[in-house]
Amino acid sequence: MAQLLTPLESILAIIPALAANGAPVLLKYHGTPIDGGKRFLDGRPVLGPGKTWEGLATGILYGSVIALLAASATCNPKLYAAGVFASIGAMLGDMLGAFIKRRLGLERGAPAPLLDQLDFYSGALLALYAAGYVVHPAVALTFTPIVIALHRLTNMAANRLRLKPVPW
């Protein structure tokens, strides 16, 4: 049965997903593509070269470390499990977003407003739910515009630091 997280638990469960989503950019485009360079039925890449096994592992690992810190700081072990699930969900949601962008004919780095900002967040929320954790509805709704703004600001910063070729 699903367990409703308190507002604080909800926030602390979502933060690892934010960390997981931002971590792969630190690899600066190095890695083995998850899709192996394969193309889908439409002739376009399944995910594209930007989604790598190394990036996936880095994101999940980074988010898991943040989850461990949150669980340790609050003496609440369920935050570790929730944070790990949120991190995995964030990475899977981001990959689904890349799959959708390729189907729409959008190249790597092309902007897709809202999809770019909310694919990983939706994936994190769904993974938490699938694992039996329900993010407090007020937090889920309040965090949506925050996630959009944070995504934009962190991507602009990554672009200025030359970690990303585009600021979106």
Swiss-Prot record:
Keyword terms, alphabetized: Cell membrane, Lipid biosynthesis, Lipid metabolism, Magnesium, Membrane, Phospholipid biosynthesis, Phospholipid metabolism, Transferase, Transmembrane, Transmembrane helix
Membrane-crossing residue ranges in chain numbering: 7-27, 55-75, 80-100, 109-129, 130-150
GO function term, MF aspect, one: CDP-2,3-bis-(O-geranylgeranyl)-sn-glycerol synthase activity
Gene: carS
UniProt-listed Enzyme Commission number(s): 2.7.7.67
Disulfide bonds: none
Presence of the UniProt keyword Cytoplasm in the record: no
Function in brief: Catalyzes the formation of CDP-2,3-bis-(O-geranylgeranyl)-sn-glycerol (CDP-archaeol) from 2,3-bis-(O-geranylgeranyl)-sn-glycerol 1-phosphate (DGGGP) and CTP. This reaction is the third ether-bond-formation step in the biosynthesis of archaeal membrane lipids.
Protein's UniProt name: CDP-archaeol synthase
